[in-house]
Swiss-Prot record:
Induction statement: Constitutively expressed during all growth phases. Repressed by osmotic stress, not responsive to a number of other stimuli.
The UniProt record lists the keyword Membrane: no
Domain 4Fe-4S Wbl-type, first and last residues per copy: 33-90
Function noted in UniProt: Acts as a transcriptional regulator. Probably redox-responsive. The apo- but not holo-form probably binds DNA.
GO cellular component, one term: cytoplasm
Cofactor binding, per record: Binds 1 [4Fe-4S] cluster per subunit. Following nitrosylation of the [4Fe-4S] cluster binds 1 [4Fe-8(NO)] cluster per subunit.
Major localization class: cytoplasm
Keywords: 4Fe-4S, Cytoplasm, Disulfide bond, DNA-binding, Iron, Iron-sulfur, Metal-binding, Transcription, Transcription regulation
Pfam families on file: Whib
InterPro entries (UniProt xref): 4FE4S_WBL, Whib
Encoding gene per record: whiB2
Biological process (GO), any one: negative regulation of DNA-templated transcription
Protein name: Transcriptional regulator WhiB2
Length: 99
């Protein structure tokens, strides 16, 4: 049947994943500058430049929350909080050794 679409059934999925919830642990994402930028810059092909993404991150007011989220969730792809996956691994290792 064609007609009005009931989107209310999708809302539980948003809550499940913590999306679009002001009280969720990703509430900072709506302030992220990367949300206004080409996402491909943050997920470059192997060997591709990360410079543009890191430049955006450097100006972003939620960079620290973004980096913490990526580290806490073991994010393995892309630039998060101004760091590549390799840089995040090194950061985690260095901070673990200091603790």
């Amino acid at each position: 049947m064609w007609g009005v679409v009931d989107d209310s059934a999708e809302e539980p999925w948003h809550e499940l994943w913590g999306l679009f919830r002001p009280d969720g642990d990703v509430s900072w994402q709506h302030k992220a500058l990367c949300a206004q930028t080409d996402p491909e810059a943050f997920f470059p092909e192997k060997g591709g430049s990360t410079r543009d993404a890191k430049r955006v991150c450097a100006k972003c007011e939620v960079r620290e929350q973004c980096l913490k989220w990526a580290i806490d969730h073991d994010e393995r792809f892309g630039i998060w909080g101004g760091m590549s996956e390799r840089e995040r691994r090194r950061y985690k290792r260095e901070h673990r050794e200091r603790a």
